From Swiss-Prot:
Keyword Lipid metabolism: yes
Class of this enzyme: lyase
Family per record: Belongs to the trans-sulfuration enzymes family.
InterPro entries with a match to the protein in the record: Cys/Met-Metab_PyrdxlP-dep_enz (IPR000277), PyrdxlP-dep_Trfase (IPR015424), PyrdxlP-dep_Trfase_major (IPR015421), PyrdxlP-dep_Trfase_small (IPR015422)
Pathway(s) served: Amino-acid biosynthesis; L-cysteine biosynthesis; L-cysteine from L-homocysteine and L-serine: step 2/2
Name under which the protein is recorded: Cystathionine gamma-lyase
Source organism (scientific name): Bos taurus (Bovine)
Length: 405
C-alpha cells in the first residue's frame, strides 16, 4: 500500500509503513532467549540438534543462520515479497539465478547494464552453454522480436547503469509473460526498495547489489533476491545452499542495521541528487545531464508513474575531451574518485575507464558511454558543499581564460 500524500516532484506516493517495517519485521525480541532488542550476531557455524536429524530451525550456517534470517525477513517486507534470500555479493546472486537455467537456454539482457553483469553474461555464462542476447528492453518491440522458444530469462535494470535509462517494468512483464514460462528479473540496485517495487509491477525476481543503497555505508559486499513464487524460492534456496555463496553473519548484521536508516537516507539522496542535477543542467561547462527526476529526462513521466522518487545517481557529459573529464575528477575534493555507489559519501567515476571498462568499446559507443561521461553517486553531505565542490572542479577543468575546445 502507498500513502495518500504525494511525494516531491510528482512521483508516486511513498509506500506505507516502510520505516516501521524496516525497523521491526524480523527483529522481534521474543525470538531470542535473551529478549535482545537488536538481533545478535550468530557466529556459530553449527547448531545443536535435539535428536539425529531433528533441528530447531538451524543446522549448519551455510544452510541457514539466525542473523541472516532476520535480514531476509526484513528485506522481504520492504519489497512487498513473500521471500528474500541473501548472497555473498550482487554477482553471487546473479550467478545463482542463472543456475535456474540449463545449457541451450537463452537470456535476454538489457544492453545497458552494470559492467560486471555484462562481463559475467558475456564471458562466463556463455562458457556454460547459455545463449546471451543484449537488447534495448526499453523498446517493447525489440524485446518482443528477441524472444525465442529458448528464451527462459529476461534481465533488466531500471534505471540502467550508467546511462540512467528507465524501463517500463509493467510493459516488459506483459511482453515476457505472454510467451509462457519466462522469468523476468529486475536489478533494483539503483532505486532500492524505498523508491521502486518491481514485484508489484510484474517482475518475478527483484535483485540487488545490497553493497549499495540497501546497506548504505560502503562497508558490506552483499546481494539480495526477493520473490513471491514458492517454487522459484524453493529452487533458489536449494541453490543458495548448494552453491554456497552466502554472506557472513557480520555482513548480515551490518546490512540489517543499514535498512533501519534506508528511508531517511534515500530521502536525503533524492534531495541532494536533484540539487546536483539541477546545478549541472544550468552549468555552461556541462553538455548534458541525465537524471530521471529532471523533466528533461526522456522517461521522466515513466519514472514518476513507476517510482516514489529518485536516488542520488546523476550522470552527465562534461564539455571537451577525456582530458577535461580527468581534470574535473582529479580536482574534486568532497566527491571521492572511486567505483561503487549508494553509500553516505559522494563518489565520482569515469565509467568508460572504470566500472564499464570490460564492456566492448563498440558497445560502449552505441550506449553513449564515452570518455566524457561522468557518473556521480551523490551522498548525504551538506548540499551547498557538494555544489561548491562540483563548481570549482568544473572551473578547473575549463578555466575561464582557456580557449574553447
Amino acid at each position: 500500500m502507498q500513502e495518500k500524500e504525494a511525494s516531491p516532484h510528482g512521483f508516486l506516493p511513498r509506500f506505507q509503513h516502510f520505516a516501521t517495517q524496516a525497523i521491526h519485521v524480523g527483529q522481534e525480541p521474543e525470538q531470542w532467549t535473551s529478549q535482545a532488542v537488536v538481533p545478535p550476531i550468530s557466529l556459530s557455524t553449527t547448531f545443536k540438534q535435539g535428536a539425529p536429524g531433528q533441528h530447531s530451525g538451524f543446522e549448519y550456517s551455510r544452510s541457514g543462520n539466525p542473523t541472516r534470517n532476520c535480514l531476509e525477513k526484513a528485506v522481504a517486507a520492504l519489497d512487498g515479497a513473500k521471500y528474500s534470500l541473501a548472497f555473498a555479493s550482487g554477482l553471487a546472486a546473479t550467478v545463482t539465478i542463472t543456475h535456474l537455467l540449463k545449457a541451450g537456454d537463452q537470456i535476454i539482457c538489457m544492453d545497458d547494464v552494470y559492467g560486471g553483469t555484462n562481463r559475467y553474461f558475456r564471458q562466463v555464462a556463455t562458457e556454460f552453454g547459455l545463449k546471451i542476447s543484449f537488447v534495448d528492453c526499453s523498446k517493447p518491440k525489440l524485446l518482443e522480436a528477441a524472444i525465442t522458444p529458448e528464451t527462459k530469462l529476461v534481465w533488466i535494470e531500471t534505471p540502467t547503469n550508467p546511462s540512467l535509462k528507465m524501463i517500463d517494468i509493467e510493459a516488459c512483464a506483459h511482453t515476457v509473460h505472454k510467451h509462457g514460462d519466462i522469468i523476468l528479473v529486475v536489478d533494483n540496485t539503483f532505486m532500492s526498495a524505498y523508491f521502486q517495487r518491481p514485484l508489484s509491477l510484474g517482475a518475478d525476481i527483484c535483485m540487488y547489489s545490497a553493497t549499495k543503497y540497501m546497506n548504505g555505508y560502503s562497508d558490506v559486499v552483499m546481494g539480495l533476491v526477493s520473490l513471491n513464487s514458492e517454487s522459484l524460492h524453493d529452487r533458489l534456496r536449494f541453490l543458495q545452499n548448494s552453491l554456497g555463496a552466502v554472506p557472513s553473519p557480520i555482513d548480515c548484521y551490518l546490512c540489517n542495521r543499514g535498512l533501519k536508516t534506508l528511508q531517511v537516507r534515500m530521502e536525503k539522496h533524492f534531495e541532494n541528487g536533484m540539487a546536483v542535477a539541477q546545478f549541472l543542467e544550468s552549468n555552461p561547462q556541462v553538455e548534458k545531464v541525465i537524471y530521471p527526476g529532471l523533466p528533461s529526462h526522456p522517461q521522466h513521466e515513466l519514472a514518476k508513474r513507476q517510482c516514489t522518487g529518485c536516488p542520488g545517481m546523476v550522470t552527465f557529459y562534461i564539455k571537451g575531451s577525456l582530458q577535461h573529464a580527468e581534470t574535473f575528477l582529479q580536482n574534486l575534493k568532497l566527491f571521492t574518485l572511486a567505483e561503487s555507489l549508494g553509500g553516505y559519501e559522494s563518489l565520482a567515476e569515469l565509467p568508460a575507464i572504470m566500472t564499464h571498462a570490460s564492456v566492448p568499446k563498440s558497445d560502449r559507443e552505441v550506449l553513449g558511454i564515452s570518455d566524457t561521461l561522468i557518473r556521480l553517486s551523490v551522498g548525504l553531505e551538506d548540499k551547498q558543499d557538494l555544489l561548491d565542490d562540483l563548481d570549482q572542479a568544473l572551473k578547473a577543468a575549463n578555466p575561464p581564460n582557456a580557449s574553447s575546445n
